[in-house]
Amino acid sequence: MTERRDNVSHAPDAIEGPNDGAHAEDTSPGFFSFENLGVAQVQVVGGTLNGFSIGFVAVYILLYEVATNCSLFKTTEACKAVGSYGCEWKDTEVCSWKKECDSDSDGVNPCESLIGYSSLYSGIFASAMIVGSMVGSIIAGKCITMFGLKKSFIIVGVMSVVASALNHISVATNEFWVLCAGRVLMGIGLGVVCVICPMYVNENAHPKLSKVDGVLFQVFITFGIMLAAMLGLILDKTVNYDNDPDMAGRFHGFCAVSSVLSVAMFLVGMFLRESTATFSQDDDGKADGGMDPNEYGWGQMLWPLFMGAVTAGTLQLTGINAVMNYAPKITENLGMDPSLGNFLVMAWNFVTSLVAIPLASRFTMRQMFITCSFVASCMCLFLCGIPVFPGVAEEKVKNGVATTGIALFIAAFEFGVGSCFFVLAQDLFPPSFRPKGSSFVVMMQFIFNILINLLYPITTEAISGGATGDQDKGQAVVFILFGLIGLICFVLQFFYLYPYDANQDHENDHGTEPVERILSPVDVPTPRN
């Protein structure tokens, strides 16, 4: 029988009594107090770095397409400035490609294959960080138990700085594989960040503020994505095609933001106060007073692990990544510039995530997550799916309904699904099992992320009858599937969060000693609820 200890986090793992809640309301620190900001800073820096790295790919690919589209540059000076990207000034007084264009091309522009990355390279580039993040989430639990949370932040900071340096080296040498190596390394660090940032807040924030601080991670992820989109819009629209476009300088400037955030992550780790939660390196946790990471076996946690995978499915398999890819296309179809449309979508994504902050002070994580997952699933099914299917609605009606559906889907997702996920990834498990449990849940969402990125375009095209088929058919069917998956996950979460034996004690493995039920904090009310 394993001894159970009480040296756990500040996070509310049990329901407070009325007097305790009132006392906490009177003596707790304010949201903008130094005490709380000292805890929440990990969400600000870690979330922004994560979000900017997510938005990094689309902007970098866009800038690379501009740099390699030699025909855009109108003067000798401008053409020579992009010589490292394969351009040269021809005797015909035009800027063209050093390589011979594909004379057998069926396209309008025979040099189209020389513009930007190939589809294979684009896929490798886009997937590199996600694969690294999956690896990082796997090793996050071991990293926490071996080094502790504070040292884990320092390690991630060092990895991020090295990854950012590789980005700058890639820009200077125009070497694709160096860029991919930097993305993989950054991904490993961010996989760890997705575990340690929410865990540090969960273990160290005041009970009154722990859930509000918890949703900040997703808020600043969306801020980082919007920041990348905004910089991409500015850098794209200010290129001087008649003089020196300074494309290398634009790449370096864009990568410098990631470098600054990486240094900030390292500094956070250096000056961060030690976490109140520590994990013992001793077999039973008695030698140094830390929690025993082996207190619970994987077999004992099968049901929480399963439900963690279900929450990860709600996060990714309802199609947030597909929606983000589909939304810029819709804005382009409506006559909007793609880069501007991309920025507006990301800005809406950020603005809606801000709503989660006041919601977290009034509702439980459970209420926010399952309610918003239901709404988001319905948006996929009834606005983005069925009306888009060919023959169901007229073209104008279809575009209007789909655009509205995407806007409402993003809002519902950020109100409760995305904002609560990283909190629930901690709260579903007892404190001593959180390094393992949270790592598993975060790993599952990265696996689902990879599956969506790989299968979404393939499935859509296949259902549509190929590249020349009606793509609306494939889009509609895929979004209907997203909605159905979301509703199935909703039903499972609804019944799990209201377990039949919620108020009953459970016995230990020997059946002789009652063991205190670990109430999932998704059931725990906030001071205002």
Swiss-Prot record:
Which InterPro entries does this entry report, sorted A to Z?
Answer: GLUT (IPR045263), MFS_dom (IPR020846), MFS_sugar_transport-like (IPR005828), MFS_trans_sf (IPR036259), Sugar/inositol_transpt (IPR003663)
Transmembrane regions listed in the UniProt entry:
44-64, 120-140, 153-173, 176-196, 215-235, 251-271, 301-321, 340-360, 369-389, 405-425, 440-460, 477-497
Gene Ontology, cellular component aspect: membrane
Q: Where in the cell is it found?
A: Membrane
Keywords, A to Z?
A: Membrane, Sugar transport, Transmembrane, Transmembrane helix, Transport
Q: Does the keyword Membrane apply?
A: yes
- Give the main location: membrane
Residue numbers on the Extracellular membrane side: 65-119, 174-175, 236-250, 322-339, 390-404, 461-476
Segments of this protein annotated with the region Disordered? 1-22, 508-529
What SUPFAM superfamilies does this protein map onto?
MFS general substrate transporter
| Biological process annotations from GO | hexose transmembrane transport
Q: How does it sit in the membrane?
A: Multi-pass membrane protein
Membrane topology (Cytoplasmic): 1-43, 141-152, 197-214, 272-300, 361-368, 426-439, 498-529
Please list the GO terms describing molecular function: hexose transmembrane transporter activity
Instruction: Briefly state the protein's biological role.
Output: Facilitative glucose transporter.
Family membership: Belongs to the major facilitator superfamily. Sugar transporter (TC 2.A.1.1) family.
Q: What is this protein called?
A: Glucose transporter 2A
Which organism does this record belong to?
A: Trypanosoma brucei brucei
List the top taxonomic levels of the source: Eukaryota, Discoba, Euglenozoa, Kinetoplastea, Metakinetoplastina
